[in-house]
Amino acid sequence: LPVNEAQCRQVGGYCGLRICNFPSRFLGLCTRNHPCCSRVWV
């Protein structure tokens, strides 16, 4: 999985207010503990 905003954007992922979404269909809560969701970005 992408580990930062740049990598996430490169694979077309995004992170909303509560949910992370990646092309691999991985879903996760946006929390400081999640490597790709340390802050809110879309």
From Swiss-Prot:
Subcellular location field: Secreted
Gene Ontology biological process terms from the UniProt entry: defense response to bacterium
Cystine connections: 8-36, 15-30, 20-37
Signal peptide, first to last residue: none
Keyword Transferase in record: no
Major subcellular site: secreted
Cellular component per GO, a single term: extracellular region
Keywords: Antibiotic, Antimicrobial, Defensin, Disulfide bond, Secreted
Entry-linked SUPFAM superfamilies: Defensin-like (SSF57392)
Pfam family, one: Defensin_beta
Keyword Disulfide bond on entry: yes
Matching InterPro entries: Defensin_beta-like
Entry's family note: Belongs to the beta-defensin family.
Name the UniProt record assigns to this protein: Ostricacin-4
